[in-house]
Protein backbone atom coordinates (compact mmCIF):
# COMPACT_ATOMS: atom_id res chain seq x y z
CA UNK A 1 0.00 0.00 0.00
CA UNK A 2 1.36 3.43 -0.95
CA UNK A 3 1.47 5.54 2.20
CA UNK A 4 0.75 9.26 2.32
CA UNK A 5 -1.17 9.37 -0.95
CA UNK A 6 -4.36 10.93 0.35
CA UNK A 7 -5.83 14.37 0.89
CA UNK A 8 -5.33 14.37 4.65
CA UNK A 9 -1.59 13.62 4.55
CA UNK A 10 -0.57 15.31 1.31
CA UNK A 11 -3.21 17.71 -0.09
CA UNK A 12 -0.73 19.51 -2.35
CA UNK A 13 -0.40 16.55 -4.71
CA UNK A 14 -4.11 16.92 -5.51
CA UNK A 15 -3.77 20.58 -6.49
CA UNK A 16 -0.22 20.79 -7.86
CA UNK A 17 0.57 18.62 -10.86
CA UNK A 18 4.34 18.94 -10.55
CA UNK A 19 4.27 17.83 -6.92
CA UNK A 20 2.00 14.95 -7.87
CA UNK A 21 4.46 13.81 -10.54
CA UNK A 22 7.36 14.05 -8.09
CA UNK A 23 5.39 11.92 -5.63
CA UNK A 24 4.56 9.37 -8.34
CA UNK A 25 8.16 9.22 -9.55
CA UNK A 26 9.29 8.36 -6.02
CA UNK A 27 6.98 5.34 -5.87
CA UNK A 28 9.37 2.38 -6.14
CA UNK A 29 8.93 -0.42 -8.61
CA UNK A 30 7.32 -3.55 -7.20
CA UNK A 31 6.27 -7.06 -8.08
CA UNK A 32 2.60 -7.87 -7.55
CA UNK A 33 2.48 -11.67 -7.21
CA UNK A 34 -1.13 -12.32 -8.22
CA UNK A 35 -2.20 -12.62 -11.84
CA UNK A 36 -4.11 -9.45 -12.73
CA UNK A 37 -6.57 -8.87 -15.55
CA UNK A 38 -6.34 -5.67 -17.60
CA UNK A 39 -9.69 -5.04 -19.30
CA UNK A 40 -10.35 -2.98 -22.44
CA UNK A 41 -13.53 -2.69 -24.50
CA UNK A 42 -14.43 -1.39 -27.96
CA UNK A 43 -17.84 -1.64 -29.59
CA UNK A 44 -18.40 -1.87 -33.33
CA UNK A 45 -19.69 -0.18 -35.54
CA UNK A 46 -17.07 2.28 -34.31
CA UNK A 47 -13.88 1.34 -36.15
CA UNK A 48 -11.02 -0.27 -34.24
CA UNK A 49 -7.82 1.17 -35.64
CA UNK A 50 -4.54 2.91 -35.06
CA UNK A 51 -5.66 5.02 -32.10
CA UNK A 52 -7.43 2.18 -30.35
CA UNK A 53 -4.57 -0.31 -30.58
CA UNK A 54 -2.08 2.04 -28.90
CA UNK A 55 -3.71 1.40 -25.51
CA UNK A 56 -3.12 -2.33 -25.89
CA UNK A 57 0.38 -2.02 -27.29
CA UNK A 58 1.48 0.36 -24.53
CA UNK A 59 0.02 -2.01 -21.94
CA UNK A 60 1.96 -4.92 -23.43
CA UNK A 61 5.23 -2.98 -23.38
CA UNK A 62 4.97 -1.66 -19.81
CA UNK A 63 3.40 -4.47 -17.77
CA UNK A 64 5.03 -7.72 -16.66
CA UNK A 65 3.41 -10.18 -19.04
CA UNK A 66 4.01 -13.09 -16.70
CA UNK A 67 1.71 -11.50 -14.13
CA UNK A 68 -1.02 -9.88 -16.24
CA UNK A 69 -3.75 -11.03 -18.57
CA UNK A 70 -4.66 -8.36 -21.14
CA UNK A 71 -8.26 -8.83 -22.25
CA UNK A 72 -9.74 -7.00 -25.23
CA UNK A 73 -13.54 -7.16 -25.19
CA UNK A 74 -15.75 -6.27 -28.15
CA UNK A 75 -19.27 -6.94 -29.34
CA UNK A 76 -17.78 -8.55 -32.48
CA UNK A 77 -14.88 -10.89 -33.23
CA UNK A 78 -11.74 -8.76 -33.64
CA UNK A 79 -9.39 -11.64 -34.40
CA UNK A 80 -9.06 -10.66 -38.07
CA UNK A 81 -8.65 -6.94 -37.42
CA UNK A 82 -5.44 -5.74 -39.06
CA UNK A 83 -4.37 -3.80 -35.97
CA UNK A 84 -5.12 -6.63 -33.55
CA UNK A 85 -3.36 -9.40 -35.46
CA UNK A 86 0.25 -8.22 -34.88
CA UNK A 87 -0.25 -8.21 -31.09
CA UNK A 88 -2.71 -11.11 -30.84
CA UNK A 89 -0.23 -13.41 -29.08
CA UNK A 90 -0.07 -11.01 -26.13
CA UNK A 91 -3.78 -10.44 -25.56
CA UNK A 92 -6.98 -12.41 -25.06
CA UNK A 93 -10.03 -11.55 -27.16
CA UNK A 94 -13.50 -11.93 -25.65
CA UNK A 95 -17.00 -11.16 -26.90
CA UNK A 96 -18.87 -8.59 -24.80
CA UNK A 97 -22.45 -9.71 -24.19
CA UNK A 98 -23.77 -7.72 -21.21
CA UNK A 99 -26.85 -9.91 -20.75
CA UNK A 100 -24.72 -13.05 -20.53
CA UNK A 101 -22.03 -11.47 -18.37
CA UNK A 102 -24.64 -10.18 -15.92
CA UNK A 103 -25.92 -13.68 -15.16
CA UNK A 104 -25.45 -14.42 -11.48
CA UNK A 105 -24.68 -10.77 -10.65
CA UNK A 106 -26.83 -8.01 -9.07
CA UNK A 107 -27.59 -6.75 -12.60
CA UNK A 108 -29.08 -9.96 -13.96
CA UNK A 109 -32.31 -9.38 -15.88
CA UNK A 110 -32.26 -5.58 -15.74
CA UNK A 111 -33.34 -3.47 -18.74
CA UNK A 112 -30.19 -1.42 -18.25
CA UNK A 113 -28.23 -4.24 -19.90
CA UNK A 114 -29.83 -3.61 -23.28
CA UNK A 115 -29.95 0.18 -23.13
CA UNK A 116 -27.77 1.89 -25.71
CA UNK A 117 -26.55 5.46 -25.89
CA UNK A 118 -25.38 7.54 -28.80
CA UNK A 119 -21.96 8.35 -27.35
CA UNK A 120 -21.35 4.95 -25.68
CA UNK A 121 -20.60 6.55 -22.31
CA UNK A 122 -23.28 4.71 -20.37
CA UNK A 123 -22.45 1.34 -21.90
CA UNK A 124 -18.81 1.93 -21.06
CA UNK A 125 -19.66 2.59 -17.43
CA UNK A 126 -21.73 -0.58 -17.29
CA UNK A 127 -18.89 -2.59 -18.84
CA UNK A 128 -16.15 -1.51 -16.45
CA UNK A 129 -18.19 -2.04 -13.31
CA UNK A 130 -19.53 -5.41 -14.38
CA UNK A 131 -16.24 -6.95 -15.52
CA UNK A 132 -14.37 -5.72 -12.46
CA UNK A 133 -17.07 -7.14 -10.19
CA UNK A 134 -17.05 -10.46 -12.02
CA UNK A 135 -13.37 -10.91 -12.86
CA UNK A 136 -11.44 -8.26 -10.94
CA UNK A 137 -8.40 -6.41 -12.22
CA UNK A 138 -7.71 -3.07 -13.90
CA UNK A 139 -9.98 -1.28 -16.36
CA UNK A 140 -8.63 1.40 -18.72
CA UNK A 141 -10.37 3.48 -21.38
CA UNK A 142 -9.25 2.87 -24.94
CA UNK A 143 -7.85 6.42 -25.08
CA UNK A 144 -5.36 5.71 -22.28
CA UNK A 145 -1.66 5.15 -23.03
CA UNK A 146 0.39 3.31 -20.40
CA UNK A 147 3.72 4.77 -19.33
CA UNK A 148 4.91 2.43 -16.58
CA UNK A 149 4.22 -0.79 -14.72
CA UNK A 150 1.10 -0.61 -12.53
CA UNK A 151 2.42 -3.26 -10.12
CA UNK A 152 3.11 -0.79 -7.24
CA UNK A 153 -0.59 0.18 -7.28
CA UNK A 154 -2.23 -3.22 -7.56
CA UNK A 155 -2.49 -4.11 -3.87
CA UNK A 156 -5.30 -1.58 -3.46
CA UNK A 157 -8.56 -0.60 -5.15
CA UNK A 158 -8.41 2.81 -6.78
CA UNK A 159 -9.76 5.43 -9.15
CA UNK A 160 -8.39 8.93 -9.67
CA UNK A 161 -9.23 12.59 -9.17
CA UNK A 162 -11.24 14.38 -11.89
CA UNK A 163 -8.87 17.23 -12.79
CA UNK A 164 -8.35 20.36 -10.70
CA UNK A 165 -11.38 22.29 -11.91
CA UNK A 166 -13.41 20.76 -9.08
CA UNK A 167 -13.38 21.33 -5.34
CA UNK A 168 -11.18 18.92 -3.43
CA UNK A 169 -11.35 18.10 0.23
CA UNK A 170 -11.32 15.11 2.49
CA UNK A 171 -15.08 14.91 2.05
CA UNK A 172 -15.68 15.66 -1.63
CA UNK A 173 -13.59 14.95 -4.69
CA UNK A 174 -15.00 14.38 -8.15
CA UNK A 175 -13.78 10.98 -9.29
CA UNK A 176 -12.70 9.72 -12.72
CA UNK A 177 -13.03 6.09 -13.76
CA UNK A 178 -10.95 6.16 -16.96
CA UNK A 179 -8.47 4.00 -15.05
CA UNK A 180 -9.66 1.94 -12.09
CA UNK A 181 -8.73 -1.15 -10.15
CA UNK A 182 -11.06 -3.42 -8.14
CA UNK A 183 -10.87 -6.90 -6.70
CA UNK A 184 -13.28 -9.59 -7.86
CA UNK A 185 -16.55 -9.43 -5.94
CA UNK A 186 -15.20 -6.83 -3.51
CA UNK A 187 -17.33 -4.63 -1.30
CA UNK A 188 -16.62 -1.63 -3.54
CA UNK A 189 -17.44 -3.50 -6.75
CA UNK A 190 -20.64 -4.85 -5.19
CA UNK A 191 -21.75 -1.42 -3.96
CA UNK A 192 -21.23 0.14 -7.38
CA UNK A 193 -23.32 -2.53 -9.09
CA UNK A 194 -26.00 -2.23 -6.41
CA UNK A 195 -26.38 1.54 -6.85
CA UNK A 196 -25.87 1.66 -10.62
CA UNK A 197 -29.50 0.89 -11.64
CA UNK A 198 -30.91 3.54 -9.31
CA UNK A 199 -28.67 6.42 -10.44
CA UNK A 200 -30.38 8.63 -13.06
CA UNK A 201 -28.50 9.17 -16.31
CA UNK A 202 -29.47 10.95 -19.50
CA UNK A 203 -28.24 10.06 -22.95
CA UNK A 204 -25.97 13.11 -22.98
CA UNK A 205 -24.49 12.45 -19.55
CA UNK A 206 -20.68 12.46 -19.49
CA UNK A 207 -20.23 12.38 -15.73
CA UNK A 208 -22.94 9.93 -14.67
CA UNK A 209 -20.27 7.53 -13.45
CA UNK A 210 -18.56 10.29 -11.45
CA UNK A 211 -21.85 10.91 -9.65
CA UNK A 212 -22.13 7.20 -8.91
CA UNK A 213 -18.56 6.98 -7.60
CA UNK A 214 -19.04 10.00 -5.36
CA UNK A 215 -22.23 8.51 -3.96
CA UNK A 216 -20.48 5.28 -2.98
CA UNK A 217 -17.49 7.21 -1.65
CA UNK A 218 -19.68 8.89 0.97
CA UNK A 219 -20.28 5.51 2.60
CA UNK A 220 -17.03 3.69 1.87
CA UNK A 221 -13.63 5.38 1.99
CA UNK A 222 -11.58 2.19 2.10
CA UNK A 223 -10.24 2.68 -1.41
CA UNK A 224 -7.79 5.13 -2.93
CA UNK A 225 -8.36 8.21 -5.05
CA UNK A 226 -5.03 8.95 -6.70
CA UNK A 227 -4.10 12.44 -7.93
CA UNK A 228 -5.14 13.25 -11.48
CA UNK A 229 -1.52 13.70 -12.60
CA UNK A 230 -0.76 10.01 -12.01
CA UNK A 231 -2.93 9.10 -15.01
CA UNK A 232 -3.87 12.38 -16.70
CA UNK A 233 -1.06 14.87 -16.14
CA UNK A 234 -2.09 17.55 -18.61
CA UNK A 235 -5.58 17.81 -17.19
CA UNK A 236 -4.21 18.55 -13.74
CA UNK A 237 -1.61 21.03 -14.94
CA UNK A 238 -3.90 22.85 -17.36
CA UNK A 239 -7.30 23.58 -15.86
CA UNK A 240 -8.73 24.51 -19.26
CA UNK A 241 -7.19 21.42 -20.86
CA UNK A 242 -4.76 23.57 -22.86
CA UNK A 243 -2.74 21.68 -25.42
CA UNK A 244 -3.99 18.30 -24.24
CA UNK A 245 -7.15 19.05 -26.18
CA UNK A 246 -5.14 18.83 -29.43
CA UNK A 247 -3.01 15.67 -29.21
CA UNK A 248 -3.23 14.99 -32.95
CA UNK A 249 -2.16 18.38 -34.32
CA UNK A 250 1.32 18.98 -35.65
CA UNK A 251 3.22 21.75 -33.91
CA UNK A 252 1.54 21.42 -30.52
CA UNK A 253 4.78 21.25 -28.58
CA UNK A 254 4.85 20.08 -25.00
CA UNK A 255 7.44 21.13 -22.46
CA UNK A 256 5.87 18.82 -19.89
CA UNK A 257 7.95 16.09 -18.35
CA UNK A 258 5.58 13.22 -17.62
CA UNK A 259 8.31 11.23 -15.87
CA UNK A 260 6.65 9.39 -13.01
CA UNK A 261 3.14 9.32 -14.49
CA UNK A 262 1.52 5.94 -14.94
CA UNK A 263 -0.48 6.85 -18.05
CA UNK A 264 -1.75 9.56 -20.39
CA UNK A 265 -5.47 10.04 -21.14
CA UNK A 266 -6.09 11.91 -24.38
CA UNK A 267 -9.88 12.23 -24.20
CA UNK A 268 -12.02 10.81 -26.98
CA UNK A 269 -10.97 12.62 -30.15
CA UNK A 270 -11.54 9.53 -32.24
CA UNK A 271 -12.39 11.34 -35.47
CA UNK A 272 -9.46 13.78 -35.47
CA UNK A 273 -6.80 12.97 -38.10
CA UNK A 274 -3.34 12.09 -36.77
CA UNK A 275 -0.86 14.63 -38.11
CA UNK A 276 2.78 13.68 -38.54
CA UNK A 277 4.75 15.30 -35.73
CA UNK A 278 1.76 15.52 -33.39
CA UNK A 279 2.04 14.52 -29.76
CA UNK A 280 0.09 11.31 -30.40
CA UNK A 281 2.23 10.36 -33.39
CA UNK A 282 5.49 10.94 -31.49
CA UNK A 283 4.28 8.88 -28.55
CA UNK A 284 2.99 6.17 -30.88
CA UNK A 285 6.42 5.98 -32.51
CA UNK A 286 8.06 5.59 -29.10
CA UNK A 287 5.69 2.76 -28.15
CA UNK A 288 6.19 1.04 -31.51
CA UNK A 289 9.96 1.26 -31.14
CA UNK A 290 9.85 -0.27 -27.67
CA UNK A 291 7.47 -2.98 -28.85
CA UNK A 292 9.78 -3.90 -31.71
CA UNK A 293 12.81 -4.04 -29.44
CA UNK A 294 11.18 -6.20 -26.79
CA UNK A 295 9.29 -8.69 -28.87
CA UNK A 296 12.03 -9.85 -31.13
CA UNK A 297 11.84 -11.41 -28.40
CA UNK A 298 12.95 -10.28 -24.92
CA UNK A 299 10.65 -9.57 -22.00
CA UNK A 300 12.29 -7.53 -19.27
CA UNK A 301 10.37 -8.27 -16.09
CA UNK A 302 11.55 -5.22 -14.15
CA UNK A 303 11.45 -1.43 -14.56
CA UNK A 304 9.25 -1.47 -17.62
CA UNK A 305 9.13 2.25 -18.49
CA UNK A 306 8.67 4.04 -21.78
CA UNK A 307 11.13 6.76 -20.86
CA UNK A 308 11.03 10.33 -19.62
CA UNK A 309 9.47 13.22 -21.53
CA UNK A 310 6.44 11.86 -23.39
CA UNK A 311 5.40 15.22 -24.75
CA UNK A 312 8.67 16.03 -26.46
Predicted feature descriptions by range:
Residues 135, 140-141:
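Active-site acidic Asp-centered loop
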Residues 125-135:
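Small-residue hinge/turn detector
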Residues 1-124, 142-312:
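Glycosyltransferase-associated regions of secretory-pathway enzymes
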Amino acid sequence: MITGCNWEDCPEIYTNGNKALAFAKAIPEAVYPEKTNFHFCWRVPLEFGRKQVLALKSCVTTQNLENVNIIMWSNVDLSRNEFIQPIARHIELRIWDPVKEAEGTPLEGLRLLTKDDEHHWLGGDLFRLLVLYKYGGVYADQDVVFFRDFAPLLDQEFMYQWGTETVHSAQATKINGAVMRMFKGSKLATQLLYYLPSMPAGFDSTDWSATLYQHVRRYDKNWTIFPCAFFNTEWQLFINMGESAHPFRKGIESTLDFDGAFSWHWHNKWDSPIEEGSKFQRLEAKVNEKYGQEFNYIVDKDRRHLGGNYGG
